[in-house]
A protein has these predicted regions:
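Amphipathic alpha-helical packing segments from all-alpha helical-bundle domains
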Residues: 97-122, 129-134, 162-170
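C-terminal peripheral helix-coil segments that are non-catalytic and often amphipathic
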Residues: 1-14, 117-119, 148-182
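Helix-turn-helix
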Residues: 13-45
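Hydrophobic alpha-helical connector segments
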Residues: 42-45, 49, 59-87, 99, ...
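Alpha-helical structural segments
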Residues: 6-7, 23, 37-60, 73-77, ...
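Short, well-structured alpha-helical segments
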Residues: 21, 25, 72, 128-136
């Protein structure tokens, strides 16, 4: 097993970003047998893995469900994934890089899946895109609060998130009517 230890001189001479990138590259190399040579390659690797895992999770979560029930199940699956795999979910929440067809394809597959869930709820076009952005913000916000324990007076983050998703889903008709008016 390789040692990833750095001497004090190396640590002081190297930016933390570079050290972390080197550590990640070594970890990825150990796990996959491939050695990413650049930070961009690592970002691609992590984003592709995150997109694929997240798509598997949300697909499984809404199996046998449709409409509001499917969307609620998807929201909970995204939150659970974000809590279990914060780095991969962060990579998957990013906008696809324009220089990598695999990244764009993985992003597009997840995006189409999500837009289809909103279509089941009567949202199309810009209304569906706006609702998707709001859902991403809702999930990220609750995930960050849960990780940092920053919501005061909350006994259960799960229960609080359940209520937030209920309110979000109940408000979807507002997006639908706004989409027809624009």
């Amino acid at each position: 097993m390789e040692s990833y230890a750095y001497s004090l001189d190396e640590i002081l001479a190297m930016s933390w970003d570079k050290k972390l990138a080197n550590d990640l590259a070594q970890e990825i190399g150990s796990a996959t047998g491939d050695k990413p040579d650049t930070v961009l390659e690592m970002r691609r690797f992590l984003a592709l893995k995150g997109y694929r895992e997240l798509l598997d999770r949300v697909s499984e979560a809404c199996r046998g469900k449709s409409g509001d029930q499917a969307l609620s199940a998807v929201a909970h699956a995204i939150r659970r994934y974000a809590l279990e795999r914060p780095a991969l979910s962060a990579a998957a929440f990013q906008t696809a890089a324009v220089d990598c067809p695999e990244w764009r394809e993985a992003h597009e597959r997840l995006h189409i899946f999500m837009i289809d869930r909103f279509a089941e709820c009567g949202l199309f076009g810009k209304a569906a895109e706006n609702a998707l952005n709001m859902l991403r913000s809702l999930v990220r916000g609750y995930m960050l609060h849960e990780i940092m324990h920053t919501l005061i007076g909350v006994d259960s983050y799960e229960d609080a998130f359940d209520k937030a998703v209920e309110v979000f889903v109940a408000g979807l008709p507002i997006f639908a009517s706004a989409g027809r008016n624009s």
